[in-house]
Amino acid sequence: MPTINQLVRKGRVSKTKKSDSPALNKGYNSFKKRMTDQNAPQKRGVCTRVGTLTPKKPNSALRKYARVRLSNNMEVTAYIPGIGHNLQEHSVVLIRGGRVKDLPGVRYHIVRGALDTAGVEGRKQGRSKYGTKRPKK
């Protein structure tokens, strides 16, 4: 326990908060060929690999994922939400932050219904999260 005098001289140092989605906090200047500090809510990228992963211990499934090379030249693993998808290699996608708890190393989600990613077919509820248009009556 520090004394009052020690606290007056040094003070408390607050811990720096680490980002949950670091790839969204970096930009890339292609003229200078160096990284910049530009935060973004989403980023565009190109799929380099599309496949399935198996989740951690208590769960069992084949979760769809895509390896994405972002516009800032970083490569990340992103989860493809919803049932069925039309993504393949060289598809242009939009990613947002948000991890998948039972897939280690997956810190991003692909936004359905944006760029080359189609919305989920036949979805009636929670459509906005899956990029599905309103059904015709």
Swiss-Prot record:
Entry annotated with the keyword DNA repair: no
NCBIfam families: rpsL_bact
InterPro entries: NA-bd_OB-fold, Ribosomal_uS12, Ribosomal_uS12_bac
Biological process annotations from GO: translation
Superkingdom to which the source organism belongs: Bacteria
GO terms, molecular function: rRNA binding; structural constituent of ribosome; tRNA binding
Region called Disordered, residue ranges: 1-43
Function comment: With S4 and S5 plays an important role in translational accuracy. Interacts with and stabilizes bases of the 16S rRNA that are involved in tRNA selection in the A site and with the mRNA backbone. Located at the interface of the 30S and 50S subunits, it traverses the body of the 30S subunit contacting proteins on the other side and probably holding the rRNA structure together. The combined cluster of proteins S8, S12 and S17 appears to hold together the shoulder and platform of the 30S subunit.
Any one cellular-component term (Gene Ontology): small ribosomal subunit
Family matches, as Pfam families: Ribosom_S12_S23
Gene: rpsL
Keywords associated with the record: Ribonucleoprotein, Ribosomal protein, RNA-binding, rRNA-binding, tRNA-binding
Subunit field text: Part of the 30S ribosomal subunit. Contacts proteins S8 and S17. May interact with IF1 in the 30S initiation complex.
Species: Oceanobacillus iheyensis (strain DSM 14371 / CIP 107618 / JCM 11309 / KCTC 3954 / HTE831)
Protein family membership: Belongs to the universal ribosomal protein uS12 family.
Entry protein name: Small ribosomal subunit protein uS12
